């Protein structure tokens, strides 16, 4: 579409794209959307296996996990899905230690999602707290993986459709470092940037050595919430954070009043919330319906929930996401929205996730230590943040003495061999994400003696209370 036409249409589209946020009583529309969606699901193989029939209430549908959909994705048949089978793309998402999971996602659903959220997203990204600064043709820089991952497909769809509202740079097939170099060369021409906080503060800002003048800075890094003031100082705008994934597609939009937070777009997803204490193990196939689920209109500020998502753009129904979110507000006053606002809190499963790039579980860490020749009494590992960098920190008690440098070298070398994502992340972000702290002999024994309740060691993401108890059990 010619730029002049888009410029003429912009005021009308801005009104249309933003006005829905001010609806006060959206519950009736939400209920209608999920009923319509379940009628479509009832006609599919996935729906039949879930027991969904015309008129089935969402409250009666089982909660689902990846293992339920895996047979459909690996051996699809005509009639299994909402859209014709030829409409589906085979998309990869990061699994654990470089072993990706496969999803089938419909091109039509992807495009419908972009049409509903795209302009609202664009206007919110450039909202400076007082006004929207977006102009037709703004240059948007992104440094996210291309190829078979979801971001690459989004880029292909947008460019093929010739939307014309933004100019996207650079080519998504460039390497990570080539994209960084592109930004360093062209940063004065860029209006909106999407990258990790680490890339911004460690690789971009030190080389430019002057504040940027961006209309918007977009990231999925959890550290954006903590470093929001520093990001404002560096980029000229507070960070905008979204929630999206291969499983759900883009289902959330950035809050303006609460930098680093987001709200779920009820036009594209039916979002339910399971209180943290009832969170689910995603190793299951399905989970029976539960009355513990809270609708979006029932969440409470300060409470932490596991997200249960039914995206309208694909075939997942009541999908238990491996993520915990915290409700920080029931509205965003700056944009006049009564939709609850959330921030990303943590993984719901026992995984260590660094920069949403590499994922490591307990069994894999045990294998790494064993194959590295490390004889240990026990260990625990967790994600820690230092400034903009995310690390995996391991606390290890050894059976036999070993020099700390040798231990670090062995474990790090094995991680580099074992996990391509671990190796690539270190190369891209230019730091080593491993930390190790040696614990004195007898630490875990003393810890278990002092610990109340079940005498168990959480090897992944130990609670802060138990970690403090462990640290105080060293002598």
State what each model feature region is.
Residues 119-162, 168-171:
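Conserved AMP-binding loop of ANL adenylate-forming enzymes
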Residues 100, 135-138, 213-214:
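Short coil/turn connectors at secondary-structure junctions
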Residues 97-100, 246:
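Gly/Ser/Thr-rich beta-alpha loop segments that engage phosphate groups in nucleotides
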Residues 28-90, 101-114, 119-133:
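Active-site diphosphate/adenylate-binding microenvironment
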Residues 91-97:
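Conserved helicase ATPase motor motifs in RecA-like P-loop NTPase domains
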Residues 112, 147-152, 202-203, 250:
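Short, well-ordered, mixed-charge alpha-helical segments that flank or form enzyme active sites
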Residues 1-44, 157-475:
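Active-site glycine/GP-rich loop and adjacent strand/helix microenvironment
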Residues 99-103, 351-353:
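Short small-residue beta-strand/loop micro-motif enriched in glycine and branched aliphatics
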């Amino acid at each position: 579409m010619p730029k002049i036409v888009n410029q003429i249409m912009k005021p009308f589209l801005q009104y249309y794209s933003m006005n829905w946020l001010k609806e006060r009583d959206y519950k009736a529309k939400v209920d209608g959307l999920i009923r319509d969606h379940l009628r479509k699901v009832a006609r599919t193989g996935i729906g039949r296996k879930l027991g969904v029939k015309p008129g089935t209430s969402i409250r009666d549908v089982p909660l689902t996990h990846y293992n339920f959909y895996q047979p459909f994705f690996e051996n699809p048949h005509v009639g299994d899905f909402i859209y014709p089978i030829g409409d589906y793309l085979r998309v990869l998402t990061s699994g654990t230690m470089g072993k990706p999971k496969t999803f089938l996602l419909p091109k039509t659903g992807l495009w419908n999602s972009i049409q509903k959220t795209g302009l609202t997203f664009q206007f919110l990204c450039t909202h400076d707290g007082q006004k929207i600064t977006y102009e037709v043709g703004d240059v948007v820089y992104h440094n996210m993986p291309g190829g078979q991952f979801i971001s690459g497909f989004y880029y292909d769809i947008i460019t093929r459709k010739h939307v014309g509202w933004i100019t996207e740079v650079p080519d998504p097939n460039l390497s990570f470092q080539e994209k960084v170099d592109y930004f360093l060369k062209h940063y004065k021409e860029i209006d909106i940037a999407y990258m990790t906080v680490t890339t911004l503060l460690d690789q971009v800002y030190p080389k430019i050595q002057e504040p940027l003048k961006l209309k918007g800075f977009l990231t999925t890094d959890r550290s954006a919430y903590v470093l929001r003031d520093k990001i404002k100082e560096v980029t000229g705008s507070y960070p905008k954070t979204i929630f999206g994934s291969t499983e759900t597609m883009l289902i959330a939009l950035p809050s303006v009043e609460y930098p680093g937070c987001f709200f779920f777009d009820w036009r594209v997803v039916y979002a339910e919330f399971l209180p943290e204490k009832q969170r689910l193990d995603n190793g299951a196939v399905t989970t029976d319906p539960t009355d513990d689920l809270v609708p979006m209109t029932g969440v409470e500020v300060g409470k932490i929930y596991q997200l249960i998502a039914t995206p309208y753009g694909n075939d997942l129904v009541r999908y238990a996401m491996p993520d915990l979110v915290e409700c920080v507000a029931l509205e965003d006053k700056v944009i006049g929205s009564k939709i609850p606002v959330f921030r990303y809190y943590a993984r719901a499963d026992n995984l260590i996730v660094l920069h949403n790039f590499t994922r490591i579980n307990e069994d894999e860490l045990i294998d790494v230590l064993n194959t590295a020749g490390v004889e240990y009494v026990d260990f625990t590992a967790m994600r820690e943040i230092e400034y903009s960098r995310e690390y995996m920190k391991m606390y290890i008690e050894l059976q036999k003495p070993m020099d700390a440098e040798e231990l670090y070298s062995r474990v790090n070398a094995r991680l580099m061999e074992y996990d391509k994502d671990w190796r690539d992340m270190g190369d891209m972000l230019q730091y080593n994400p491993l930390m190790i702290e040696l614990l004195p002999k007898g630490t875990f024994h003393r810890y278990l003696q002092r610990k109340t309740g079940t005498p168990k060691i959480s090897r992944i993401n130990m609670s802060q209370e138990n970690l403090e108890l462990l640290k105080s059990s060293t002598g």
